[in-house]
């Protein structure tokens, strides 16, 4: 949509696979765990979810929504088993694929009005942080539209101007 008004955004899709798994001897208290390799996991109800956030140079092809089970078998599971011994015996329950809208400039959201096109507001490029930030961003953008300014949160630092000037 931004391209329709001539706005070139540094945002592209990045494919992410989330694996849902269970184990016999569940760790009693398991926090969000992120291994230096990018493999991560956390509790999700009675099961666990996990995956890998690879380096940008190792990103999987994002033109499909195919689940890479080999990635789970060869990378995710062995890394989790090394980090959390109870995960040596995991059972994969299901998996899904989605895309992040990844901001290649600075991995932060692009928020607020377009400086020249009236009634055009940005709220994209969250780079995987959208779910966590959406309540605050929704409120801030609503204030901006209703009152012409941010009131509860000043999010000007995430404005389109930094993108136009290529300033992370």
Regions found by a protein language model. Name each.
Residues 8, 22-119:
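Active-site lid/adjacent beta-loop-alpha segment flanking the redox-cofactor pocket in flavoenzymes
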Residues 15, 36-37, 127:
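Short acidic/glycine-enriched loop/turn segments that link adjacent beta-strands
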Residues 78-168:
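C-terminal catalytic lobe of FAD-dependent flavoproteins
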Residues 15-16, 158:
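Short linear loop/turn motifs
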Residues 1-7:
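Flavin (primarily FAD) binding-site architecture
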Residues 9-15:
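Short hydrophobic/aromatic-enriched beta-strand-loop microsegments
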Residues 18-20:
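Sec-dependent N-terminal signal peptides of Gram-negative outer-membrane/periplasmic proteins
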């Amino acid at each position: 949509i931004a391209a329709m008004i001539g706005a070139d955004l540094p945002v592209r899709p990045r494919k992410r696979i989330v694996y849902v798994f269970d184990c016999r001897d569940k760790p009693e208290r398991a926090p969000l765990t992120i291994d230096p390799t990018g493999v991560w996991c956390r509790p999700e109800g009675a099961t666990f979810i996990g995956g890998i956030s690879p380096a940008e140079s190792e990103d999987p092809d994002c033109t499909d929504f195919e689940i890479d089970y080999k990635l789970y078998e060869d990378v995710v599971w062995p890394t989790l088993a090394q980090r959390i011994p109870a995960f040596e015996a995991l059972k994969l329950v299901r998996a899904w694929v989605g895309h992040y809208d990844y901001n290649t400039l600075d991995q932060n959201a692009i928020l607020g009005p377009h400086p020249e096109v009236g009634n055009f507001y940005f709220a994209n490029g969250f780079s995987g942080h959208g779910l966590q930030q959406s309540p605050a961003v929704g409120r801030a953008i609503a204030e901006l539209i209703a009152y012409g300014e941010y009131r509860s949160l000043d999010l000007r630092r995430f404005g389109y101007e930094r993108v136009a000037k290529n300033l992370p």
